[in-house]
Design a protein with these regions (language model features):
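Short, solvent-exposed amphipathic alpha-helical segments in soluble enzyme
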Residues: 42-47, 119-123, 144-146
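Long, charged alpha-helical interface segments
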Residues: 190-248, 252
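N-terminal nucleotide/polyanion-binding subdomain common to many enzyme families
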Residues: 1-95, 220-244
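Structured adenosyl-cofactor binding patch, chiefly the S-adenosyl-L-methionine
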Residues: 137, 141-190
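Oxyanion-binding "anion nests"
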Residues: 251-259
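Fold-independent oxyanion-binding glycine-rich loops
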Residues: 30, 59, 106-109, 131-134, ...
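S-adenosyl-L-methionine/SAH cofactor-binding core of RNA-modifying enzymes
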Residues: 83-133, 138-139
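Hydrophobic/aromatic beta-strand patches that form the interior of the parallel beta-sheet core
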Residues: 26-28, 55-57, 102-104, 127-129, ...
Length: 259
């Protein structure tokens, strides 16, 4: 008999019967104890249970038989083990459903996750994230459930959980009421094809280095111009690919926001 492996992650009095906030994330994973992890701290943690909610589905709970396991050796041979489609499929079927939310499988071969993805997801009612482990997931699961693959970058992690945390952090911080200044999200790197300008705070002098005078001038137009100039310089020096996009005047999908 398969026990209920669907667990709400606590957040400010949030319980199994409480009404979920507008943005709800479900993590399907072999290691549910990893959550909320850092998502339970700082701004995302303070908003958990109030602005957004999180639950996990433990894939291990859907193993059947005395010698059941979540993974098996790959057909055709090769290194590593592959997550079984029958076990993961059960987790997807009984884990609460997608409920109109998009579902992504965290994978290094997926489409690159961008700020535009975060903006788009933050406007919806949540997301379902399927975390891979071992050598990966049986392809039939992705095909049957029409699950899109998404990647956090050109590197390989031990599993999808850390990538899922990064993806959720990028989305949740854009939800209304999460950040103290709602303009913060629109002024950061990748909200436009420019990297962010430098930041300074008190003290005005530290180890012989002064805060640029323009930032202490109170002249808002001059400050805005200085910040744009710095953002352009940093982008040109560090990310020629973004600089080319910026100077061409085009805005590809990774920078386009839905109105």
């Amino acid at each position: 008999m398969i026990k209920d492996q669907h667990h709400n992650v606590a957040g400010d009095g949030h319980d199994d019967h409480a009404q979920k906030p507008p943005f709800h994330a479900t993590i399907i994973t072999v290691f549910p104890e990893m959550f909320p992890g850092p998502l339970g701290l700082s701004t995302t943690g303070r908003a958990l249970g109030r602005v957004w909610s999180l639950d996990t589905v433990d894939v291990k709970g859907f193993v059947t038989g005395p010698f059941g396991r979540v993974d098996d050796s790959p057909f055709g041979g090769g290194a590593g083990m592959v997550l079984r489609p029958d076990v993961v499929g059960q987790a997807l079927d009984t884990g609460g459903g997608f409920q109109g939310r998009p579902c992504y499988y965290l994978s290094p071969r997926g489409q690159r996750f961008t700020q535009a993805h975060a903006v788009s997801l933050a406007k919806g009612n949540g997301v379902v994230l399927l975390c891979g482990r071992y050598e990966g997931l049986d392809q039939r699961v992705l095909d049957h459930y029409n699950i899109a693959e998404i990647s956090m970058g050109d590197y390989v992690l031990s599993g999808g959980e850390i990538a899922a945390m990064a993806m959720l952090d990028a989305c949740v911080r854009l939800l209304p009421g999460v950040m103290g200044n709602d303009d913060s999200g629109t002024e950061e790197s990748f909200s436009a094809p420019l990297l962010e300008y430098p930041h300074y705070t008190r003290p005005a002098e530290w180890k012989g280095m002064d805060v640029p005078k323009v930032l202490r001038s109170g002249h808002h137009a001059a400050i805005k111009a200085w910040r744009k100039e710095q953002a352009e310089r940093i982008t040109r020096d560090r990310r020629p690919d973004l600089w080319e996009i910026y100077t061409s005047g085009t805005r590809p999908d990774c920078f386009v926001k839905d109105d």
